[in-house]
Every structure is written in structure tokens, then in C-alpha cells.
């Protein structure tokens, strides 16, 4: 059967076919085009060979990096300085009404070179400081424990319970005191700074200056920049399995996958056969043990178990605890999708600090080291990306021009072949040209060339004895979509 096929698309301009009868001296730069096609074929052969070598060697090269990149640590200092405080250790006389203090929050990158200095604001997304103070107790408000302490209760208790009861009373009193203190705290002042990409400000520290003569508690909240999912916090059960509190989602998925491989938890034909034999032995043992049991017990013992399918993962006790499920087996894709529910964004850093006015400065008393490798090692936009895009656009325009020139060359080759044949055999060439033009006209006209009477009086039905002719006509109708 004759079927119509689509022409093979030309992927590259150099894939164009150059007729052998074209003379090099008549077509300009034809020799250069042949050299270009030959060089292109060599380049394709080399790239194919290198691609095969890479595909063969890549699976065997599973060795990870021996020396991971060093962690970049940011040290955060929180301290206060005091001026004109009568309780300071400077020994100079001061006026209590003019006592001022300054709270400073600054950060420095450890092991930082002088050339590549990073300001503290580069690592921050926002900073909030809440100053808290205890509310004064009301005159009629009394503590519950005071009334109980004022009554001498002489209760006789066993000797071995005296110590325990005393410790319990003290603990309850401390809990009540802490809960009462937290409930009495009120925010007397607050300060907040957030990063604004339209108004970028660089600084190495934040100074907050206030006037006061009493110690003051404050809560400092620091939100680091770069919390975009590259580094997340794991759930407690997932952190127990992986051995790290934070990391990426890809690391968590890879760790679970390695745990499944090491413990042979994939359901394969071999493991399924082993499980089937173990189940058969267990069922036979149960039947032997329950040989004299009643009918109801026999029905319960013969209930078939839900067996896992091929490609699923058998969940042991640790995986069931990590994934928070009671299922005995799950598909691998469900295990991967469940990992997204076990991670959360990195929480902000919260520090409780007390401004101490008894010292001139508390520098170095409160420090915190934070890993900022995920912020410094983020991929930066390439400065030459725009130039590369412009170069790609120029290359695309040149490829289009080469394609157009190749089409013009093929058209000129057909004209050259026609006139060359016409100069050698003019009569035969013109006769063949008229016949091919007539055939093309019939093809273009299609059904318009034939009318109904001509189709009825045609001898196509009288020559039905010729099977080859009949099959050819049917194939032609099928190829044109007319049947």
C-alpha cells in the first residue's frame, strides 16, 4: 500500500545536500561550504563519542566531595554601654537623673578577609526589639501563697515524705512566681527594622539609646536573609533519622532513600518470595497451635494479610514513626511527598537580654554564632548573561541566513541541471517537461478535472481483472483520503 510520508526536517543548515554535478568554479564559495559540512560532521562525531563516554563513566563515579566547603560563621554581639550611672563600676560621681544606656546589636563574619568585607545588614531580613517591664502589683491584689505561708500548719506526715513534700512546695512556688512574672510583663517600647530592596542600607550594627536608671529586660528577634527553602528545619523524628537538625529537602529525601536501600526495604521479587515463605511458615505454625480451637478462632487465623506490591517500600518501626503513619508499606512517591510535610522554614533567632546598668559595658558577655553558608553561597547573577543572550541572538540570525542561502543554492542547482540537460538534449528535455507539467496540473486540479459522466464511462471497472491495477487505484484513493 502506498502511504504518504512527511519530509525529513533539516535540523542544521549544514545538513543540506550539495549535488555532485555542481561545478566548483561556477558557484562561489562552494568549496568552503563543503569544508564546513565536513567539519560539522567531524564535530558531531566527536560530541557523540564524548557523550557516550560520559554516560558510561558517570554512574560509576559516585564518590562525593572529600572536602566540603567550610562553614561561614557570623558572630552576633549583644551588649549595652552605660553613661552617668551611679551604680556603674567606674567610680566617678554621676547624676541618676541623667543616666543613659545604649543597646548595640552588631555582627561580624569570622575569618573574613579585608578585601571581601560583608556588612551585618547583608545577612538580615529583619530585626525587632521589645523592651519589657513588670507591671506594678495592685494594693488589693495579694499572692495566693502568702496566705498559706502565714498559717502554721502542723500536719503529721510520714518521715520519708517530708523532703518530697517540701521540694514539691518549692517547685510549685517557683513555677507560680515565673508564670506570674511573665503575665505581669508589658512592652514599654519597641523597635523594628526590615530590609527594603528599594532602599538598601548597609550597617555593621544597630544602636538603641534610651534614658533610664533601672535594669530593663528586652526580647531581640533576628530574622536571617535567604530563608527560601534551600535550608529548612527538620522535624524531631526526621532529625533523629538523618542526624542533623537543619538541611535541604533534597538531603532529607536522599537520606531516607539511602536508609531504605541499606535496610533492604524495597519490595522486589526476591523479598516478596521470602515474605511469602515466611508467611506460609507462620500460618502453618499458627494452624498447628490452633488445631483444637473453635470455628471462630479458625476463621480469624485464616484471614489473609495485605501483601505489598512490587515497587513499594516496607515501613519499619522507625520509618513509621518518622512518617507518622501506621501503614506497613507505602509507594515510594508517597514517601517522597510526605517529606515536604516534615520540614518547616528556619525559625527566627530570639534572644532574651537584660540591660545591666551596673557596668560601663557588657561587651562579650552575650554572643551567638550562626551558620550563614547558605546565604553567602547563593548563586549570583552572572554579569555576562546579557552579552551571552545577545551573542545567541546573533548566532540565530546567522543560522537563518545560512538556511536561506542553502535554499537558494538548491534552487539554483535545479535550474542549472534543467538548462544543462536542455543544452544537451533539447527535444527530450522539453517533452519530459511538458509531460511533468501536465501531470502536476492533473494533481493540482484533483476532482475538478473529472466530471460525473467521465467517471461513469471510465474503463476502470472493465479492467477489474487486473488485480495489480485495481490495488494501485485503491491505494491511490486511500493515500488521498478519498476512501
UniProtKB/Swiss-Prot annotation:
It is found in: Nucleus. Residues 171-180 have a biased composition (Acidic residues). One of its GO terms (molecular function) is structural molecule activity. Its main location: nucleus. InterPro entries: SWIB_MDM2_dom_sf. GO terms for biological process: chromatin remodeling; nucleosome disassembly; positive regulation of transcription elongation by RNA polymerase II. The keyword Transcription applies. GO terms for cellular component: chromatin; nucleus; RSC-type complex. Residues 142-183, 273-309 are annotated as: Disordered. Keywords: Chromatin regulator, Nucleus, Transcription, Transcription regulation. Residues 148-158 have a biased composition (Low complexity). Component of the chromatin structure-remodeling complex (RSC), which is involved in transcription regulation and nucleosome positioning. RSC is responsible for the transfer of a histone octamer from a nucleosome core particle to naked DNA. The reaction requires ATP and involves an activated RSC-nucleosome intermediate. Remodeling reaction also involves DNA translocation, DNA twist and conformational change. To yeast SNF12. Present with 2470 molecules/cell in log phase SD medium. Interacts directly with RSC8. Component of the two forms of the RSC complex composed of at least either RSC1 or RSC2, and ARP7, ARP9, LDB7, NPL6, RSC3, RSC30, RSC4, RSC58, RSC6, RSC8, RSC9, SFH1, STH1, HTL1 and probably RTT102. The complexes interact with histone and histone variant components of centromeric chromatin. This is Chromatin structure-remodeling complex protein RSC6. It comes from Saccharomyces cerevisiae (strain ATCC 204508 / S288c). The gene is RSC6.
Amino acid at each position: 500500500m502506498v502511504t504518504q510520508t512527511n519530509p525529513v526536517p533539516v535540523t542544521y543548515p549544514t545538513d543540506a545536500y550539495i549535488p555532485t554535478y555542481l561545478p566548483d568554479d561556477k558557484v562561489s564559495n562552494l568549496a568552503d561550504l563543503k569544508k564546513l559540512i565536513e567539519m560539522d560532521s567531524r564535530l558531531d562525531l566527536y560530541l557523540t563519542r564524548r557523550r557516550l563516554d560520559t554516560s558510561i563513566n558517570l554512574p560509576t563515579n559516585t564518590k562525593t566531595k572529600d572536602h566540603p566547603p567550610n562553614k561561614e560563621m557570623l558572630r552576633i554581639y549583644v551588649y549595652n554601654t552605660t553613661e552617668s550611672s551611679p551604680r556603674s563600676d567606674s567610680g566617678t560621681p554621676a547624676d541618676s537623673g541623667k543616666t543613659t544606656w545604649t543597646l548595640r546589636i552588631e555582627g561580624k563574619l569570622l575569618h573574613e578577609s579585608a578585601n571581601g568585607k560583608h556588612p551585618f545588614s547583608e545577612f538580615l531580613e529583619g530585626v525587632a526589639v521589645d523592651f519589657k517591664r513588670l507591671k506594678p502589683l495592685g494594693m488589693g491584689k495579694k499572692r495566693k501563697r502568702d496566705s498559706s505561708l502565714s498559717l502554721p500548719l502542723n500536719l503529721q506526715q510520714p518521715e520519708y515524705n517530708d523532703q518530697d513534700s517540701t521540694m514539691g512546695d518549692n517547685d510549685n512556688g517557683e513555677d507560680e512566681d515565673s508564670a506570674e512574672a511573665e503575665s505581669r510583663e508589658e512592652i514599654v517600647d519597641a523597635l523594628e527594622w526590615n530590609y527594603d530592596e528599594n532602599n538598601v542600607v548597609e550597617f555593621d550594627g544597630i544602636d538603641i539609646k534610651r534614658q533610664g536608671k533601672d535594669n530593663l529586660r528586652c526580647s531581640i528577634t533576628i530574622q536571617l536573609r535567604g530563608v527560601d527553602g534551600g535550608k529548612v528545619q527538620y522535624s524531631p523524628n526526621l532529625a533523629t533519622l538523618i542526624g542533623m537538625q537543619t538541611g535541604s529537602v533534597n538531603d532529607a529525601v536522599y537520606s531516607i532513600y539511602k536508609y531504605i536501600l541499606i535496610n533492604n526495604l524495597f519490595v522486589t521479587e526476591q523479598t516478596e518470595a521470602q515474605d511469602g515463605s515466611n508467611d506460609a511458615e507462620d500460618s502453618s505454625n499458627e494452624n498447628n497451635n490452633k488445631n483444637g480451637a473453635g470455628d471462630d478462632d479458625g476463621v480469624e487465623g485464616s484471614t489473609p494479610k495485605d501483601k505489598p506490591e512490587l515497587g513499594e517500600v516496607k515501613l519499619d518501626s522507625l520509618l513509621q514513626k518518622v512518617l507518622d503513619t501506621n501503614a506497613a508499606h507505602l509507594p515510594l512517591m508517597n514517601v517522597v511527598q510526605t517529606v515536604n510535610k516534615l520540614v518547616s522554614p528556619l525559625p527566627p533567632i530570639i534572644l532574651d537580654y537584660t540591660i545591666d546598668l551596673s557596668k560601663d559595658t557588657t561587651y562579650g558577655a552575650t554572643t551567638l554564632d550562626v551558620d550563614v553558608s547558605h546565604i553567602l553561597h547563593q548563586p549570583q547573577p552572572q554579569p555576562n548573561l546579557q552579552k551571552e543572550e545577545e551573542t545567541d541572538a546573533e548566532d540565530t540570525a546567522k543560522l537563518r541566513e545560512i538556511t536561506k542561502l542553502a535554499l537558494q543554492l538548491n534552487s539554483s542547482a535545479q535550474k542549472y541541471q534543467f538548462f544543462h540537460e536542455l543544452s544537451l538534449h533539447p527535444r527530450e528535455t522539453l517533452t519530459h517537461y511538458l509531460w511533468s507539467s501536465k501531470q502536476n496540473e492533473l494533481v493540482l486540479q484533483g476532482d475538478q478535472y473529472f466530471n460525473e459522466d467521465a467517471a461513469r464511462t471510465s474503463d476502470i471497472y472493465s479492467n477489474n481483472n487486473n488485480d495489480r491495477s485495481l490495488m494501485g487505484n485503491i491505494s491511490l484513493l486511500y493515500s488521498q483520503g478519498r476512501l
